[in-house]
Amino acid sequence: AIALGQRKVGGRSSMIDVMLIVIRPLQWVNDIAGRIGRALSVFAIAVMVIVILTQVFFRYVLNNALPWPDEAARFMMLWLTGLMAPVAMRQGGMVAITSVLESFPRPLFKLVSLLLLVISLTVLIVGVQLGWKHVNSGWLFSSSSLKIPMSIVGLKSFKIKLAWMYMSLFTGICLMILVNVELILRSLITSLGGGQRLRQVPGISGDSLESEA
């Protein structure tokens, strides 16, 4: 019986070691993507605020609304959402109804949480396929008002393809798939008793980690 128990512990430890090898490069990729996403999102918010204030000034002060600010703000909002959704998902910042789950016994809570992550991964895989089709269709159409002002350097200006807007959805879903896989691995490692060997997710406090263990 002791030997059997030791084999079980050894097998569990080996599984944890394998999953840790897989999760480490994934954590590194998600860390880098998160930092870049946050920086670009701050830039997008700044541009969006400037564009909206410019439109307000022209529309209500000069009584001569510009044709492009509304679409430019929408462009920035789409990319802001696509870049920050993976960050929010990784840090547990997505809107969720947890009161029912928290009433479950701890083992059942972990099992249901893992099941929900697997379902989410399935939905995201379908979403990335639909998103890619949407991006491809976007190359056929151009924005009604957004242009690259190449006339500044003496070249012909051209309208931005809608695919660049739709790409925000595709990019966001791809990044969320990476985050989802990391969360599944973290859940499995924690369930097997290796939670203390996991590196803390940037942006999550130690108290939050203790509540998940």
Identify the residue ranges that each predicted region occupies.
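Alpha-helical transmembrane segments and membrane-interface helix-loop junctions
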Residues: 2-213
